[in-house]
Amino acid sequence: MKKPNIVFVFGDQWRAQATGYAGNPTVKTPHLDRFATESINLTQAVSGYPVCSPARASLLTGQFPLTHGVFVNDVHLDNSAVSIAQAFKQGGYQTSYIGKWHVDGHGRSNYIPPERRQGFADWKVLECTHNYNQSAYYSGNSDQKLFWDGYDAIDQTKAAEDY
């Protein structure tokens, strides 16, 4: 049996109510609407710590901030923390992370070396930015800063589709 593709979408400042599939008649999200019908959709999930870095560290490790130690933004998630990427790799999956990382804690625009990527193999990432148009990122193991062509979310989605 072929293993299913598993895709997580971590949105910043994005409420579920801001989608068509959740019933908002004003917001048009046809691709997300279709994605939601073909996916597991957690409609009653909450964050135990609704701050970017702690929430991302929890999503990556399955641990509460008290365990993984990331209590505020811009704090490094310990390299020894077992991540979802490592678990999927053990299950025979290839892993990719595209977009905002925000658990490195070594500067918002600095290159993140492989040993601080929690096991993700494919990589198109910037630690953190709030510029969503033509922002910088690093790809693979290169420390050369690249730039998305247009609106980041569109280019990042294309990169995920290409992967």
Regions found by a protein language model. Give the residues of each.
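Formylglycine-dependent sulfatase
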Residues: 1-163
